[in-house]
């Protein structure tokens, strides 16, 4: 399974968990133990929120309404 498919699988699991819990759920993505980004899924409006962590800077947050687009963004961040 490619890394991109692994990311999509994790995001689909995040969606399913959020739907069952009825509250926003969050997942972290790391490289060599360093947090690169986190993703929250909001069931109410069916959107993802990507937070990108950069050393020495304030985290940047980006909204996505498409699982494919947020998956590609995460994939690029992890490269």
Swiss-Prot record:
Pfam family, one: DUF1797
InterPro entries in UniProt: YkuJ-like, YkuJ-like_sf
UniProt KW Nucleotidyltransferase keyword: no
Keyword line: Signal
Signal sequence coordinates: 1-20
Keyword Transport: no
Origin: domain of life: Bacteria
Protein name: Uncharacterized protein YkuJ
UniProt gene name: ykuJ
């Amino acid at each position: 399974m490619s890394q991109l498919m692994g990311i999509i699988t994790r995001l689909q699991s995040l969606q399913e968990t959020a739907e069952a819990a009825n509250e926003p759920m969050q997942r972290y993505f790391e490289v060599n133990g360093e947090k690169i980004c986190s993703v929250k899924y909001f069931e109410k409006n069916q959107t993802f929120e990507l937070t990108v962590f950069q050393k020495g800077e304030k985290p940047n947050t980006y909204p996505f309404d498409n699982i494919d687009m947020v998956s590609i963004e995460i994939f690029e961040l992890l490269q």
